[in-house]
Amino acid sequence: MDYTISEFGKVFLFLLFGVVFVIGGYVSSRMLRPHRPNDEKLTSYECGEEAVGSAWVQFNIRFYVVALIFIIFDVEVLFLFPWATVFKQLGGFALFEAVIFVTILTLGLVYAWVKGDLDWVRPTPNVPKMPEKRFDNISSGRSQVVKEESVS
């Protein structure tokens, strides 16, 4: 009977030792460190300055859109590297599939560009200014048209 470790067994042992090493380090540091919490230790550190305001800040949605577009194209590169290494063995069909893949992603980029998601400074719409008197009539339920009084 052969008791040698297969290739997957070596990977499993490597992962097992890695997990045991990390958990062992965490547990031993929890057991050996002094535990003396105070208010100064619980405050946030901002380059030696006192913290001003709340740490919870709402970011503009444009940051997230740009980050998602970056991640999509970063993953595209991850898929194209293995394809490029075996391109000669796969032939023309692989080239056709890669062209379709890149075309679909390019169409997505063009869509985001046309939609304006890549424009950092978006143009503001030109909204006509209406007198507040008209809003009062709309919210009160009266649908009569109120004539504007001219100011001389």
UniProtKB/Swiss-Prot annotation:
Location within or outside the cell: Cell inner membrane
Q: State which residue ranges cross the membrane.
A: 8-28, 63-83, 90-110
Give a GO molecular function annotation for the protein: NADH dehydrogenase (ubiquinone) activity
Q: How does it sit in the membrane?
A: Multi-pass membrane protein
Q: Which reaction(s) are listed as its catalytic activity?
A: a quinone + NADH + 5 H(+)(in) = a quinol + NAD(+) + 4 H(+)(out)
The answer, when asked if Cell membrane is one of the entry's keywords, is yes
Q: Which domain of life is it from?
A: Bacteria
Q: Which UniProt keywords apply?
A: Cell inner membrane, Cell membrane, Membrane, NAD, Quinone, Translocase, Transmembrane, Transmembrane helix, Transport
The EC code for this enzyme is 7.1.1.-
- InterPro entries (alphabetical): NAD(P)H_OxRDtase_bac/plastid, NADH_UbQ/plastoQ_OxRdtase_su3, NDAH_ubi_oxred_su3_sf
Q: What's one GO-annotated cellular component?
A: NADH dehydrogenase complex
What is its biological role?
A: NDH-1 shuttles electrons from NADH, via FMN and iron-sulfur (Fe-S) centers, to quinones in the respiratory chain. The immediate electron acceptor for the enzyme in this species is believed to be a menaquinone. Couples the redox reaction to proton translocation (for every two electrons transferred, four hydrogen ions are translocated across the cytoplasmic membrane), and thus conserves the redox energy in a proton gradient.
Family assignment from sequence similarity: Belongs to the complex I subunit 3 family.
Note the subunit structure. Answer: NDH-1 is composed of 14 different subunits. Subunits NuoA, H, J, K, L, M, N constitute the membrane sector of the complex.
Name of this chain's protein: NADH-quinone oxidoreductase subunit A 2
